[in-house]
Amino acid sequence: DLGAEKFYDIKCRMNNLQPAATILVTSLRALKWHGGVPLPEIGKENMDALINGLPNLKAHIISLKRFGQQVVVSLNHFANDNEEEIDVVRKECLAAGVRFAISDGFAKGGEGALDVAREVMAAVKEGSKPLNYAYSLDESIEEKIQDVNTKVYGGQDVSYSSAALKDLAKIKALNMGFEKLPICIAKTPFSMSHDPDLKGAPHGFTLPVQRVILNAGAGFLVVTTGAIMRMPGLPKKPA
């Protein structure tokens, strides 16, 4: 919901790239966290929490397939992972029509990543469809934000702060075509939504837009949502 959407809608669009496949990385621990387990306990066996967290994985799979991608789910393996829990995730992926492989590269090096490599090669051979972007550049800024919110995040509506409304008015008043730029939405990485406390696959929420910032040189509009701190662009040798 963050890296993939921006990669497709900004980088691939601007550089005419067509990915042959996309790897979706997950782990039993991450799924249990989305299933409501506190961080200190995510390494323990907990089938109920795993099942409760699966909607998050399914939401990402649906999103990637909507973009037209061949998807390979790569499960990062930990030494104490339970085989029955792994099998549940495997079956979920196969039922969703995507490939599945276990990645054990941390413990076994390259040999531990061979299964993932094989599945990726098979996916690449089959090939993805031409990218189906989340929005058209001809849409208004508000329409683009709403498209990403509904198609990728699972939200329903968008609200705008007074500062964001002023930002939009200023950008449009420039009358230089900046409304046609792609959007780069800044939000929490801990949820499909803007709220880090909303785990799993929340839906029907209202996305609160705080600011809309023109980055003319970079060629996109930054849309900040919720309480988010943007990543600083630092030089190779920060002061």
Each predicted region: which residue ranges?
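P-loop NTP-binding site
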Residues: 1-85, 89-239
